[in-house]
């Protein structure tokens, strides 16, 4: 029997489980997002199946790309557990978090090449705003090799009721 899926706000005590279950290596992303959460910049969300983390997302309280809404970003569900409702659960939880803070909507930035993610967001009611932005970042793979990436992002939004 598969353990129930839950989504909640990450806590510092979750760091060891996050590093084991969703390793980010030299990027140390979990620690960085927890620090930004402590500073009030973001809310770090984790989906759990039992005591195993199976996905993450970040609500940035200042949206990018000209959005007046907070933005759900860094949504990640590992390929072995995709198409099991985890991404959808994280999106809905992010909407609830934004709504609980009195926000009128939520934005999601999606890389123009990520057709599968865009289809999910559109199925959930998100609408392409026509706004675009380009961002660059660096990440490190398991071997420690550095990779520079550039994303061409389109902004989708959902008005929250």
Please state what every model-predicted region is.
Residues 56-69, 134-149:
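Conserved acyl-donor/pantetheine-binding loop and adjacent beta-alpha core of acyl/acetyltransferases
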Residues 98-109:
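Conserved GNAT acetyl-CoA-binding A-motif
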Residues 77, 90-94, 106, 121, ...:
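Hydrophobic packing within well-folded, soluble alpha/beta domains
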Residues 3-5, 9-80, 91-93, 97, ...:
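Acetyl-CoA-dependent GNAT
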Residues 42, 149-156:
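Short hydrophobic/aromatic beta-strand or adjacent loop that forms the aromatic wall/cage
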Residues 87, 91, 113-117, 133-140:
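Short glycine/proline-centered loop/turn elements that form peptide/ligand docking sites
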Residues 78-80, 84, 112-113:
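Active-site acidic-Proline motif in GNAT/NAT acetyltransferases
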Residues 109-110, 122, 127-147, 154:
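Conserved catalytic-core motifs of GNAT/GCN5-like acyltransferases
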């Amino acid at each position: 029997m598969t353990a129930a899926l839950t989504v909640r706000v990450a806590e510092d005590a979750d760091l060891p489980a996050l590093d084991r279950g969703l390793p980010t290596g030299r990027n140390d992303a979990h620690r960085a997002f927890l620090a930004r959460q402590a500073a009030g910049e973001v809310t770090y969300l984790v989906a759990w199946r039992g005591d195993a983390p199976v996905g993450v997302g970040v609500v940035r309280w200042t949206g990018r790309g000209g959005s007046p809404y907070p933005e759900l970003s860094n949504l990640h569900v590992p390929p072995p557990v995709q198409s099991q409702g985890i991404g959808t659960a994280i999106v809905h939880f992010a909407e609830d978090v934004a709504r609980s803070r009195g926000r009128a909507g939520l934005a999601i930035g999606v890389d123009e090449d990520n057709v599968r993610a865009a289809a999910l967001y559109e199925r959930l009611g998100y609408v392409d705003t026509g706004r675009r932005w380009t961002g660059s970042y660096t990440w490190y793979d398991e071997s420690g090799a550095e990779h520079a990436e550039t994303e061409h992002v389109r902004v989708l939004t959902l008005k929250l009721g």
